[in-house]
């Protein structure tokens, strides 16, 4: 089940430095490296003269005592924290930014300041969960230690002021809905548009991640083309997140609700979008966004280290089709970036805009080595491989027509899950190279960013050649 703001996140329950069952080791180039050792702040911990009767003890950096005390007194209104200088149940400290891929994302209550449980105490677990919740964030705002308003610049170049903490949110753009989940902001969702959840398998997976899914899905009301102003007014969200290509922005403006625009059709813009999403929700979400960016950078570096020396003439040509076989991805779309990172050459990369409709003569002229179809819109491999007109193509003749995977969110879209799409595509294009293993990384990814323990048979099926 997905992490909530009322329970300690799964990763913390199993230990801040432990994800060995789902996080890859760092022994070969196909496995995620271990995190760099955490550097604690140089401030000496502050201890009380006498340990008071408290549910747990804490070792606290000197400059974090005020924040810790504010949280403690908000959670235990009549209590006094027991601050000690060693052997504490909870370590409250500042840490340097990790240089490698983190094996866990610690509870971050202020930028760069974390809560590290040192025991299995349920009281510690409950307190840590509170500290990174909306209520904990509010306690730090009331103490003047976090801002009551944050100002972000969205991907349309707009400066947007957002009251903190964020309580309710409408997401009308599926890729951004996935970003909200990946940074632990889903508790704020009042309604959302979801990618990949229309089929039974996608809906079942989404319900396993978030039991509220059936109550939240709002595709009939909110999408890039639809906006039900009456329903939006009823839900009264603090914020609306949507695509830069959305058609109803003027209508939404009538409500006076701030909205943040996204346009993440390149890897750099996707990383920017994730960091933007983290900033909407506070320090814990910002830390999760930073961890995802580090993970994405590791994957792209691992793939590029294997593919960047391949001569242009030896790179397979790839066609990415859309919901119809004759609809193809342009060079302005994220799918083209995935192909390039994985070591291929997009045959339709010179096209501009969004999806382009072409004819079979054009595809025959391109004659791609590999064809990728998406896992949405009813697109199938068989629509191409069983069509007699397509038998002239090299990709069809050599059996290299594949369907991009998905659990819920399709792995080709500008969303967090696309990190796995890079791995999967590189395995299809260059099976002989040492690239990160799809099944290992899918386990790591969904545990870390969705707190979902994906069943082994399911992940093996998703990563398999289809």
Residue ranges and their predicted role:
Residues 171, 177-235, 239-245:
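A short, structured surface patch at a secondary-structure boundary
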Residues 44-57, 76, 158-165, 183, ...:
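Immediate post-signal peptide segment of exported/extracytoplasmic ligand-binding proteins
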Residues 61-80, 134, 178-187, 196-207, ...:
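Short, polar/charged alpha-helical segment
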Residues 52-62, 80-83, 150-151, 167-170, ...:
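Short, well-ordered beta-strand elements
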Residues 122-126, 146-152, 159, 248-327, ...:
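Extracytoplasmic substrate-binding proteins
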Residues 328-355:
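Alpha-helical, coiled-coil/dimerization segments enriched in small aliphatic residues
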Residues 47-148:
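Exported/periplasmic ABC-transporter solute-binding proteins
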Residues 14-50, 103:
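Ser/Thr-rich, Proline-interspersed low-complexity disordered segments
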